[in-house]
Swiss-Prot record:
Keywords: Cytoplasm, mRNA processing, mRNA splicing, Nucleus, Ribonucleoprotein, RNA-binding, Spliceosome. Residues 14-94 form the Sm domain. This is Small nuclear ribonucleoprotein E. Present with 556 molecules/cell in log phase SD medium. The keyword Ribonucleoprotein applies. It is found in: Cytoplasm; Nucleus.
């Protein structure tokens, strides 16, 4: 019997963003110091500073009481450039 421990390889953040771009995965982006707003859309470009270009972007208000997104009140933004400094989290919207 072997005592080898299985370890998972670390995935660099840039690779994760690149996968979202390649697969055209809808994403939700949480903003730094803007807990009442999230951005949904598709990543169509990014750079080494994690600035991202989002297409079909929608600004979604978040209820401060329960943290739920109010998608019906979303504001369409179209194509936007979001600076990496403003991004707290990027996750799949699926």
């Amino acid at each position: 019997m072997s005592n080898k421990v299985k370890t998972k390889a670390m995935v660099p953040p840039i690779n994760c963003i690149f996968n979202f771009l390649q697969q055209q995965t809808p994403v939700t982006i949480w903003l730094f110091e803007q807990i009442g707003i999230r951005i949904k859309g598709k990543i169509v470009g990014f750079d080494e500073f994690m600035n991202v270009v989002i297409d079909e972007a929608v600004e979604i208000p978040v209820n401060s009481a329960d943290g739920k997104e109010d998608v019906e009140k979303g504001t369409p933004l179209g194509k936007i450039l979001l600076k990496g400094d403003n991004i707290t989290l990027i996750t799949s919207a699926d």
